[in-house]
Amino acid sequence: MQLTHLLAFALSLATSEAAYKGFNYGATKSDGSVKSQSDFESEFSTAKNLVGTSGFTSARLYTMIQGGTTNSPISAIPAAIAENTSLLLGLWASGGGMDNELAALKSAISQYGDSFAKLVVGISVGSEDLYRASSEGEKVNAGIGIGPDDLVSFIKEVRSIISGTALSSVPIGHVDTWTAWTNGSNSAVIDAVDWLGFDGYPYFQSSMSNSISDAKSLFDDSVAKTKAVAKGKEVWITETGWPVSGSTQNLGVASLANAKTYWDEVGCPLFDETNTWWYILQDANPTTPNPSFGVVGSTLSTTPLFDLSCSNSTRPSASASSSAAGSATPVGSAVPSGSAAVNPSSSGIVSSAVPSTTPGFTVGKGFRPSNSSAAAYYSSASASGSAYPKFTKTASGSSATSTTAGSSSDSSSTNSGKSSSESSSTNSGASASSSILATGGASSVSGSVFGALVAVFAFVATL
């Protein structure tokens, strides 16, 4: 009887502490049409049953607002309840629409109650707002952003709203580029959040040597820089990926083979170890953007475009994950910004022409441009010492390349534009152990889980 209880306890620890693994989901399709609840349900079901995987059961959203409405909760919420898919919520903080985002959050809490609350693993307040508000972001028309003071105020407001509700223990974070996180003027945001969201795209680091063979080192370097300023708080990987098709960015070639390599070398070590939201399940419905990051094509199918299986050799060892749990926590991604404006209802981002009830911005880091437009690609810190990358756009606006800025050692992978069907990613990780446990577990506790399992089975061996 004692043995049975010990084994059950060990297994419950392993189950409860598993890292979240999912995709980013925009509020609209690639043609700008608004997604319905059934659309989200189909996507969530497909993600859970992808051939070669154990299932991607979490979804990162860019906005709380359903497309075509002023402040009604996004239909991804009832879809997630129906499909038992966990949620990393996103509130678009720039452009003057925060009041409507907060109204939608309040409505979701009252309308869906505990069935909704139990699925929420985190809340991201804004995405890449700090980058867009920077001088470098303004130079490339990255879109409307906000500074650290306003962002901290919004974070406090969200904490106040969820206090005393079923979401009171949910960790709150913000998603931005590593250059924004490492800019000392933004340190107040790090102090205000429970976790930091990171997005990184080596493919778009076109001012550097960014071939697929360099991708893992570029990604790891940018994550390390973010963790170095995180003050011990978790970094969640909220957005990263490699395109299956599209234009070439310096040495970065979009192809199925390279997307598979990036999945193996960057994704597989993260999955089940670090909270990770990949970019993206599908971005080619009904039109295919340039570049396209979807692991499935224009037709939603559980059969992916390339092999998604992860061999044991691509995963960190149990001892490595336990000893490096703090450094291996996922990093988040950031919200859209770039050359093409998107509608938040579809991607979580909206153009300046869209009412302030939906986020307004253009494609930039961490965001995929709508349709064929590409993001303003992020590269490295500017030569002037600014922590923000410089970008130049092509005349067509369909693609952009970053200007040379900073040495390669100062550069790390960041984000890029995405299709309008997706919105910019946000991410986070709970820093406090209480927050982590409250949300069902995070990568930082993987070491303690492993230790508990070892202790239990060692004890069993003595019986």
From Swiss-Prot:
Broadest EC class assigned to this enzyme: hydrolase
PTM remark: The GPI-anchor is attached to the protein in the endoplasmic reticulum and serves to target the protein to the cell surface. There, the glucosamine-inositol phospholipid moiety is cleaved off and the GPI-modified mannoprotein is covalently attached via its lipidless GPI glycan remnant to the 1,6-beta-glucan of the outer cell wall layer.
Membrane-related topology note: Lipid-anchor; GPI-anchor
GO MF, one example: glucan endo-1,3-beta-D-glucosidase activity
Keyword Hydrolase: yes
Residue segments, region Disordered: 317-354, 396-430
One GO location term (cellular component): plasma membrane
Residue positions bearing lipid (GPI-anchor amidated glycine): G440
UniProt-listed Pfam families: Glyco_hydro_17
Record propeptide residues: 441-463
Residues with attached carbohydrate: N84, N183, N312
Keywords assigned: Carbohydrate metabolism, Cell membrane, Cell wall, Cell wall biogenesis/degradation, Glycoprotein, GPI-anchor, Hydrolase, Lipoprotein, Membrane, Polysaccharide degradation, Secreted, Signal
Active site (record annotation): E128, E239
Subcellular location: Cell membrane; Secreted, Cell wall
Keyword Cell wall biogenesis/degradation: yes
Annotated signal peptide: 1-18
GO biological process, one term: polysaccharide catabolic process
Domain of life: Eukaryota
Coiled-coil region: none
Main localisation: membrane
Catalytic activity: Hydrolysis of (1->3)-beta-D-glucosidic linkages in (1->3)-beta-D-glucans
Gene3D superfamilies referenced in this protein's UniProt entry, alphabetically: Glycosidases (3.20.20.80)
Assigned EC number: 3.2.1.39
Family: Belongs to the glycosyl hydrolase 17 family.
Cross-referenced PANTHER family: GLUCAN 1,3-BETA-GLUCOSIDASE, GLUCAN ENDO-1,3-BETA-GLUCOSIDASE EGLC-RELATED
Name by which UniProt lists this protein: Probable glucan endo-1,3-beta-glucosidase eglC
Lineage, opening ranks: Eukaryota, Fungi, Dikarya, Ascomycota, Pezizomycotina
Gene: eglC
